[in-house]
Amino acid sequence: MSQDQQQQQQFNANNLAGNVQNINLNAPAYDPAVQSYIPNTAQAFVPSAQPYIPGQQEQQFGQYGQQQQNYNQGGYNNYNNRGGYSNNRGGYNNSNRGGYSNYNSYNTNSNQGGYSNYNNNYANNSYNNNNNYNNNYNQGYNNYNSQPQGQDQQQETGSGQMSLEDYQKQQKESLNKLNTKPKKVLKLNLNSSTVKAPIVTKKKEEEPVNQESKTEEPAKEEIKNQEPAEAENKVEEESKVEAPTAAKPVSESEFPASTPKTEAKASKEVAAAAAALKKEVSQAKKESNVTNADALVKEQEEQIDASIVNDMFGGKDHMSIIFMGHVDAGKSTMGGNLLFLTGAVDKRTVEKYEREAKDAGRQGWYLSWIMDTNKEERNDGKTIEVGKSYFETDKRRYTILDAPGHKLYISEMIGGASQADVGVLVISSRKGEYEAGFERGGQSREHAILAKTQGVNKLVVVINKMDDPTVNWSKERYEECTTKLAMYLKGVGYQKGDVLFMPVSGYTGAGLKERVSQKDAPWYNGPSLLEYLDSMPLAVRKINDPFMLPISSKMKDLGTVIEGKIESGHVKKGQNLLVMPNKTQVEVTTIYNETEAEADSAFCGEQVRLRLRGIEEEDLSAGYVLSSINHPVKTVTRFEAQIAIVELKSILSTGFSCVMHVHTAIEEVTFTQLLHNLQKGTNRRSKKAPAFAKQGMKIIAVLETTEPVCIESYDDYPQLGRFTLRDQGQTIAIGKVTKLL
């Protein structure tokens, strides 16, 4: 055979081998000129591949619809397309350069492409959203990140041909790798309730940084792996978590699991995400702390130290005392004499009143005219409105509240008692007058009950008119009066240590400022009235609590002026407050203290007058409450209360209506439900609701008012949570608010 024939035969053999190679799927032709695109090239190294071009990854998904259109034209099942539809290799027509005639053979050897490994990794690599695409792409798309091992190795051999021995060796190595235990893949399951992973929302500023890191990854791998034989297959897990209520994805992380380095990198990414989240939380806490700190500083600036208040008034605290008792018991006379003895009224003024009273035929009433400034009160000799006067001693500042004793003006007495700290119950020892005031229907008994109900827990019982010729400082008469009173006051609720009895003479002043002379009453060695009041302990003043002032009266004097006692907190000139229940915001323009002088501030326990801006006088009413804006007083129409029935001729049942007096407010109230009956002695609640209530019973009931009323729970603010019920001109029950409904 000639040399030319041998060359021709060798050429034909080579040509035949090339044709077989093109037809056989086991060794498809490799064309270096065609760029091989492999998804996520950071995990699959191809020596002959061109450097990764940014934006090509978006083409992987952006041309999905176009690739699906070519699927029917080529008649080629896409799930066998060399590891997934993403491996386009420049287009569908170019990816099958060997033709379609051996399509079945191609499918039978598809294990070379790594589809057996697909079944092993399916559980871990499932995309979970593959139903959004055509079912024909379920397998290929879920495993698009698993580059077939056989194809990588074939491409690594370059453009040369592969012998049968090399193919068998390659297939054996592929099977051995497929049979090995898959490496653990680092997973981040954000939907699991048992795995606590940081959920980080990617900021827009961070996205370009992440893309650059992914773009630089192939170059790093190419530098590291210079020899094709050292290339390793990398398996990545991409987890996309989309919150159902969020407008943007919560997290998107890639975790390669081929080497410890990639695992460490993933751990660093998680740690970085956790650090970012921790930084955001700490920043939020810091801002919150700054806000809270500013609010705290502002609140501390508004708070007043009690020592500062004492220094403002020379260390003297304030006390409001109310003179109460039956009509003609001598209340106004005693109050006027106290003002004269303490220097609040000068001698010249008293002499003037004495001359005027003598001319009017009321010679013995001149001291009462100091308190009764109204002409009608002076003519009739009885107090109609609650008179207010101010005096000082060496230890304290006092406001006298002179309550009317007549039963027609009991409402005014209740309003005055609600503003008092200490009660002075004036009892006339003159024969006939004591019996009229203390027996049934007398105002001495009712005033004692009303004082207790309105929070007057300290009571001084002064037996007045001991200088009267019918008494003449008699010890027997004094003991007769005090014995009956002590038993009655104990039944009302006063403890033994809360009540003090003393004999006085309001007209002569004996026992008011100085002690009773031993010549007149050798049997009494107790203190005088002012001596006892100066030494009496007072309740703690809550000057830094929310401001509350029940309005007792109103007037128009160059604006709207209201008057009342500050029950809680303090007020400053220029401060904004809220009038409840009409929720009107007002500004305090002027503050007048007890001496009618202007002041910059006023504190809990003081009787003040405030000029307000922002509201008209006709929009106010007695019983409204001036409170702080941040903590306004509660306004309700229904509430639950504990009620003790003191005097009731008939029975009380659901639907019963009466008049309620609470602080300075007067409202009509109706019993809507009787809940429990309280057992005597233990106050244990009955399981069955009572059908009615009568005198002497204690019950829990639900009351409803016709108009909104400003009240608080008795446990929170006792001065705004106690009330009195009156019907047909008499007090029938007392109570306290237990729950607001």
Curated annotation (Swiss-Prot):
Stretches for region G2: 381-385
**Where does this protein chiefly localize?**
cytoplasm
Region feature (G5): 505-507
Residues of the region (G3) are: 402-405
Q: What does this protein do?
A: Involved in translation termination. Stimulates the activity of ERF1. Binds guanine nucleotides.
Could you tell me which residues belong to the region Several sort of repeats? 5-135
Name of the protein in question: Eukaryotic peptide chain release factor GTP-binding subunit
Spell out the subcellular localization from the entry. Cytoplasm
Write down any Gene Ontology CC term. Answer: cytoplasm
Which keywords are on file for this protein?
Cytoplasm, GTP-binding, Nucleotide-binding, Phosphoprotein, Protein biosynthesis, Repeat
Q: Which CDD domains match?
A: EF1_alpha (cd01883), eRF3_C_III (cd03704), eRF3_II (cd04089)
State the residue spans of region: G1.
325-332
Compositionally skewed regions (Basic and acidic residues) per UniProt: 166-175, 202-241
Query: Tell me, what is an example of a GO biological process annotation in this record?
Result: nuclear-transcribed mRNA catabolic process, deadenylation-dependent decay
Residues annotated for GTP binding in this entry: 325-332, 402-406, 464-467
Give positions of region: Disordered: 59-186, 199-264
Q: Which GO terms describe its molecular function?
A: GTP binding; GTPase activity; translation release factor activity
Q: Where is this region: G4?
A: 464-467
Region Charged: start-end pairs: 162-311
Phosphothreonine PTM sites in chain numbering = 399
Q: Where is the composition biased (Low complexity)?
A: 59-161
